[in-house]
Amino acid sequence: MGQIFSRSASPIPRPPRGLAAHHWLNFLQAAYRLEPGPSSYDFHQLKKFLKIALETPVWICPINYSLLASLLPKGYPGRVNEILHILIQTQAQIPSRPAPPPPSSSTHDPPDSDPQIPPPYVEPTAPQVLPVMHPHGAPPNHRPWQMKDLQAIKQEVSQAAPGSPQFMQTIRLAVQQFDPTAKDLQDLLQYLCSSLVASLHHQQLDSLISEAETRGITGYNPLAGPLRVQANNPQQQGLRREYQQLWLAAFAALPGSAKDPSWASILQGLEEPYHAFVERLNIALDNGLPEGTPKDPILRSLAYSNANKECQKLLQARGHTNSPLGDMLRACQAWTPKDKTKVLVVQPKKPPPNQPCFRCGKAGHWSRDCTQPRPPPGPCPLCQDPTHWKRDCPRLKPTIPEPEPEEDALLLDLPADIPHPKNLHRGGGLTSPPTLQQVLPNQDPTSILPVIPLDPARRPVIKAQIDTQTSHPKTIEALLDTGADMTVLPIALFSSNTPLKNTSVLGAGGQTQDHFKLTSLPVLIRLPFRTTPIVLTSCLVDTKNNWAIIGRDALQQCQGVLYLPEAKRPPVILPIQAPAVLGLEHLPRPPEISQFPLNPERLQALQHLVRKALEAGHIEPYTGPGNNPVFPVKKANGTWRFIHDLRATNSLTIDLSSSSPGPPDLSSLPTTLAHLQTIDLKDAFFQIPLPKQFQPYFAFTVPQQCNYGPGTRYAWRVLPQGFKNSPTLFEMQLAHILQPIRQAFPQCTILQYMDDILLASPSHADLQLLSEATMASLISHGLPVSENKTQQTPGTIKFLGQIISPNHLTYDAVPKVPIRSRWALPELQALLGEIQWVSKGTPTLRQPLHSLYCALQRHTDPRDQIYLNPSQVQSLVQLRQALSQNCRSRLVQTLPLLGAIMLTLTGTTTVVFQSKQQWPLVWLHAPLPHTSQCPWGQLLASAVLLLDKYTLQSYGLLCQTIHHNISTQTFNQFIQTSDHPSVPILLHHSHRFKNLGAQTGELWNTFLKTTAPLAPVKALMPVFTLSPVIINTAPCLFSDGSTSQAAYILWDKHILSQRSFPLPPPHKSAQRAELLGLLHGLSSARSWRCLNIFLDSKYLYHYLRTLALGTFQGRSSQAPFQALLPRLLSRKVVYLHHVRSHTNLPDPISRLNALTDALLITPVLQLSPADLHSFTHCGQTALTLQGATTTEASNILRSCHACRKNNPQHQMPQGHIRRGLLPNHIWQGDITHFKYKNTLYRLHVWVDTFSGAISATQKRKETSSEAISSLLQAIAYLGKPSYINTDNGPAYISQDFLNMCTSLAIRHTTHVPYNPTSSGLVERSNGILKTLLYKYFTDKPDLPMDNALSIALWTINHLNVLTNCHKTRWQLHHSPRLQPIPETHSLSNKQTHWYYFKLPGLNSRQWKGPQEALQEAAGAALIPVSASSAQWIPWRLLKRAACPRPVGGPADPKEKDHQHHG
């Protein structure tokens, strides 16, 4: 009674089961017209009544709501009666459709309905749809959409097309319930409909709105904006409802098709450029859009909605979701798909937890990695068994188990007498399992035919035991044939007295009379899959013993079906196993390189080569992705070679590290292995299978001539040539094949490099066995051997470009060196490359090679002509003579290895040899390192390490003795005095060294095959001698340099010589300047044999120490100057000392070094006092310190226009403030405003109360964060204070500022703003700072604010002088602390003042004292308040007192009043 129910929470309540959706929507719309609105209880009663009404016959279409209301009982709960009343009124207002014409009258009775004749067509009645109506006077019920509302509406209309009655009824009901604005309706449209439907609806709505605005709408104001904008106002209820009716009416003009056309499903690919996607959309719209339909809005809508996610993010970020198409294209023109092919992210695996796994109960692994099945959460709901899941319940599985056939045999024990025998199919029916399932569906287990397995490789043959009862049982192989009516057995199974009858047999060869006989004796046949024998009452006998056939008469008793397994083609597995790692395991996107066109000749050759590769099984047809171009190349003999350009695939491939360091050194073959044989493999790379997943990276296309058709696609089945990992993979596979052979023949040696194999054996018999075993292993693995290229001793053995003789090696092709001075760059480069190939056997030093290498340098054009100088031409002569002696010995295992190292100015030459041999084993050359200095100790240690590495790798031995060309004295001196890292290496190998010294040429002339003696290398001799202690009788040389100048000082009890000079303009190097200063200093000290050199350059210090021990000059930009040092230091005794610069120590070394540094400083032009004031506007005292007199400083201040305008008195008034006892004791802070160029700056100022030093920063705000930032900058500038004192502004009393002060251990107090006693110092500092800023901006209006503030702080802190102490604020801020006040101190002769005082903060009216002031300052005095402490007392709490007259002393005539104020 009068109860008001709440609105339903769900936007569309569910209809009762059996009620059509459009009927339920009519009931809902009528319910929502109730005032107040319906409750959930009303809907519950409505559903309950409709369920009852659905069972009555009155439920027809259209519904008679009056008849339905008569079924409603009186007093039915809820408001169902009101809902039916609204429906009855609405139904009466809707005009009824015209009734169909009555059927034509007939005099005859209607005939009986014929079931063959269909009834006449009756047009279905369209469901009635109620219009959207708002009750008069109803309050606005607008509520924005929520996601659950949109989802519920979309679920209701998911099966309806836009504009259909069900769609419109649902939308009307939602609009009536939520009363949406224009923006809400637009959101609903985008959520429900596709971009095409939304675009078409938008066009229709625009046209309807234009018509409505033209004819006028109640409540529409043209001056307030368009209708769509005014409808967004929730208060405009009537105007909003007009917009809702127009929005719903726009659906009536939509096309009837609910499906979008084909061009609406065009989507942008993940890697498709955006402009290409828009171009496809544009073409599709031109071809498929109806005439008259505007294309631009649809194109813009689809260009955003159908783009991929990355382009949609770009468009959203730039606000171009519905912008002009040009803006959208420009926004996405720089977008490229992310390159995911080169990125390999490896995330470390987290350690497993210590807790046990909840599946198996064991620790040490994650539950996701557990192999045990997951336990069920509870008992099975079907059988209540907690050990299995519901999906595994036995009740859900079929009760008939299916027998599993065995692979080897099938043994069925079936009864001999079957009540219902089944006739087998005629015609030799062999049945496979799928056919069997189709023939025998749903049979019980006793009627399933036994499956007889057959071997497809041997035809349907089976072993059977035949017992003819006239002889012993015999086992034969019989052919199973369901096409034979009778069983045929050979006559050999029967005895001679077996009765046989003549018969005629019709078979494939025709009718025969005498080939087969008929026996009537019973025959027993036992089959392997049956325990009970088959009994035949008669059978055919083959008189020629050719056939044994078990026919249909025997198989009929078995009731079996022959099962021939599907012929699975065995996979083609090459003998060599496929490699496990290929280098493409991360599977990047395969390359797509287009095939370039070929001329007819090349195309024909390519097709022939592809045909041969296809026949050989190296390639196969392919239809997948990926492509790399191919082309043929003609060889010198006229044949063609197949080339596959795999550069794109190689760029994606990871290099596999090869286990082979390179080709073996054939000199390591011992002379005892005299019997040799070479094996050459044909098409070696084509024997390694290529896994299927890598075929896209090795695919290619053979084009059609003139592009008459699509090309033919192929892919490699084996590793192709041109793939960068093919040699490494083949080398590993071949090593795996040869490893068992190596183990079987330990006395022999097998050399393998790529596809070349060399067999070495001590005897001919062993070589034959080794050769046969190797050949058999290679052939068994599918590696073809080229017989015509096999070489064997006795005879010449050519292997890897070298000729192997019994005791020596020579190169197959030794280059010929023409002697001429003019060379083309490619010619000389090719010649040096060939010489480098044969350099291991060429008896020459590094010098002629280095001379020709230098000729190749400093050339940038490959077409250059090179002109050799006479020394380089002589190097060609030496090389041609050395190449004529090119030969190497083979290893003699009974002799030790020896080494010889020759250090020269051009590099290092190393020789490995054995005694009493005609030729060395190998020659090794190494250039100098690319450094400015190469100590010979470092070169010798590097050569020893290289020698040991090579001999161990090639011969498996170390050199017993190493000869070098360094004298014993030089070697010992280097070991004793040098701190180079090579010293431990030389000490470790010193027991193997043999110093040749001055007898260098004797051993090396034997190697070089010459009689000319070799000159000793002068660079190995020490240039000068280092003294371990300072030389007292020698002068001292100091030198230094900068990027622009160099200087030196020569001192011997006084300065003998000093000089500074600038560097040449092109060079601005500090190292060059330091070296130049040292050279000039050494030139001035040329006459002294001993010298003390002091350097603050570590570079020069280490360079001179290395030069003293012997070094080679390397490549350096300072090489011309470095070459002068040995001349100036030759035969001198030098003491070297490194000085640390800028130490300010009082010793003479630091003083003279600082004096040398001072020579490098360019004098700065001193500013005149007038210029300084015009720049900084400093005070009079600061000008006097800069050299001006008092009168000149006063005149400068009076003549300054900015000072007269902004500060006529030229000083600030004095204030009174409690000061700190020492720097950074107490600070005061404040924020003052400064307006300049319409910008209000907040100057955060901090002042030290002891020194008056100021720190200021300009900000735009007064927040706590700005205050904290300014305080931190002040601390970085002045130091950390103990106390800070500010006003009680919001920035200073904020919690953030207080927390920051607490974290820095700073005590914060507040004072009264603008109080001269408590805040006078910071206020006066604000005035000084702002006065200077006004002066600067008066002179320079365009001066930046930060620059002006920096100049002002420099002027206040560093230039202006305090009058009371005659120091600047910065000097006072960094002055030493006050001495502690002793308990007893002697009276000084200085005039002192005595004061009565009161302690601040106490209300006592009694004066204390008098006490003598320790220090006086502006505003306060330091008074000892106790025997151990003093305190600053302001003037207002002080009274001057007369000094007590000392005993016996005269009275001070000036002191007349003993009680007066200061």
Curated annotation (Swiss-Prot):
<keyword id="KW-1262">Eukaryotic host gene expression shutoff by virus</keyword>
<dbReference type="GO" id="GO:0006310">
    <property type="term" value="P:DNA recombination"/>
</dbReference>
<dbReference type="GO" id="GO:0008270">
    <property type="term" value="F:zinc ion binding"/>
</dbReference>
<keyword id="KW-0695">RNA-directed DNA polymerase</keyword>
<dbReference type="GO" id="GO:0004190">
    <property type="term" value="F:aspartic-type endopeptidase activity"/>
</dbReference>
<keyword id="KW-1190">Host gene expression shutoff by virus</keyword>
<feature type="domain" description="Peptidase A2">
    <location>
        <begin position="476"/>
        <end position="554"/>
    </location>
</feature>
<dbReference type="InterPro" id="IPR043502">
    <property type="entry name" value="DNA/RNA_pol_sf"/>
</dbReference>
<dbReference type="GO" id="GO:0075713">
    <property type="term" value="P:establishment of integrated proviral latency"/>
</dbReference>
<feature type="lipid moiety-binding region" description="N-myristoyl glycine; by host">
    <location>
        <position position="2"/>
    </location>
</feature>
<dbReference type="InterPro" id="IPR036862">
    <property type="entry name" value="Integrase_C_dom_sf_retrovir"/>
</dbReference>
<protein>
    <recommendedName>
        <fullName>Gag-Pro-Pol polyprotein</fullName>
        <ecNumber>3.4.23.-</ecNumber>
        <ecNumber>2.7.7.49</ecNumber>
        <ecNumber>2.7.7.7</ecNumber>
        <ecNumber>3.1.26.4</ecNumber>
        <ecNumber>2.7.7.-</ecNumber>
        <ecNumber>3.1.-.-</ecNumber>
    </recommendedName>
</protein>
<keyword id="KW-0543">Viral nucleoprotein</keyword>
<dbReference type="GO" id="GO:0039657">
    <property type="term" value="P:symbiont-mediated suppression of host gene expression"/>
</dbReference>
<dbReference type="InterPro" id="IPR002156">
    <property type="entry name" value="RNaseH_domain"/>
</dbReference>
<dbReference type="GO" id="GO:0004523">
    <property type="term" value="F:RNA-DNA hybrid ribonuclease activity"/>
</dbReference>
<keyword id="KW-0863">Zinc-finger</keyword>
<keyword id="KW-0064">Aspartyl protease</keyword>
<keyword id="KW-0449">Lipoprotein</keyword>
<dbReference type="InterPro" id="IPR008919">
    <property type="entry name" value="Retrov_capsid_N"/>
</dbReference>
<keyword id="KW-0677">Repeat</keyword>
<dbReference type="GO" id="GO:0005198">
    <property type="term" value="F:structural molecule activity"/>
</dbReference>
<dbReference type="InterPro" id="IPR008916">
    <property type="entry name" value="Retrov_capsid_C"/>
</dbReference>
<keyword id="KW-1160">Virus entry into host cell</keyword>
<feature type="region of interest" description="Disordered">
    <location>
        <begin position="93"/>
        <end position="142"/>
    </location>
</feature>
<dbReference type="Pfam" id="PF00665">
    <property type="entry name" value="rve"/>
</dbReference>
<dbReference type="InterPro" id="IPR003308">
    <property type="entry name" value="Integrase_Zn-bd_dom_N"/>
</dbReference>
<keyword id="KW-0479">Metal-binding</keyword>
<keyword id="KW-1179">Viral genome integration</keyword>
<dbReference type="Pfam" id="PF02022">
    <property type="entry name" value="Integrase_Zn"/>
</dbReference>
<feature type="DNA-binding region" description="Integrase-type">
    <location>
        <begin position="1393"/>
        <end position="1443"/>
    </location>
</feature>
<feature type="binding site">
    <location>
        <position position="680"/>
    </location>
    <ligand>
        <name>Mg(2+) 1</name>
    </ligand>
</feature>
<dbReference type="InterPro" id="IPR036397">
    <property type="entry name" value="RNaseH_sf"/>
</dbReference>
<keyword id="KW-0597">Phosphoprotein</keyword>
<feature type="domain" description="Reverse transcriptase">
    <location>
        <begin position="614"/>
        <end position="804"/>
    </location>
</feature>
<feature type="site" description="Cleavage; by viral protease">
    <location>
        <begin position="344"/>
        <end position="345"/>
    </location>
</feature>
<dbReference type="GO" id="GO:0003677">
    <property type="term" value="F:DNA binding"/>
</dbReference>
<keyword id="KW-0645">Protease</keyword>
<dbReference type="InterPro" id="IPR021109">
    <property type="entry name" value="Peptidase_aspartic_dom_sf"/>
</dbReference>
<feature type="zinc finger region" description="CCHC-type 2">
    <location>
        <begin position="378"/>
        <end position="395"/>
    </location>
</feature>
<dbReference type="GO" id="GO:0015074">
    <property type="term" value="P:DNA integration"/>
</dbReference>
<dbReference type="InterPro" id="IPR001995">
    <property type="entry name" value="Peptidase_A2_cat"/>
</dbReference>
